[in-house]
Amino acid sequence: MKGTVTVKNLTNKVVKEVHVGLLQFDNKGYPVDVEYSWEGEDNLLNCRMQSANIEPNRSYGSGTYWDLEDQVKKIKACVKSVKFLDGATWENEYFDYWLKAEKSSY
């Protein structure tokens, strides 16, 4: 399966890089663990959109994807952090809450 995520820049800055947490599930909604520990843990895959260069009010991700395990049929995604072109960063303070609430089932 190919996992794709589209993000929209709702700021007035150019987004250089986006870090997305991607939860993987099978066709019955059960978690599918990542194959390699350096990619993530449990069913959380750590994904980066590098050199995205998303201008304000623009979207990015259409036509880009990550190759996922064959048994993955459904995904959930959440932005974990953003790096702006000016060097500033944004961390999603709610990411860990989202992960805890969403990782067990689809």
Listing of model-derived features with the role each one plays in the protein:
Residues K13-E17, P31-D33:
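Short acidic/proline- and small/hydrophobic-mixed sequence motifs that coincide with surface turns
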Residues E91-E93:
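Extracytoplasmic/secreted cell-surface and envelope-processing proteins
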Residues H19-Y30:
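Extended low-complexity, serine/threonine- and proline-enriched intrinsically disordered segments
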Residues T6, G21-L23, C78:
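Soluble periplasmic/extracytoplasmic beta-strand elements of cell-envelope proteins
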Residues M1-T4, H19:
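Short, solvent-exposed loop/turn segments enriched in Ser/Thr/Gly
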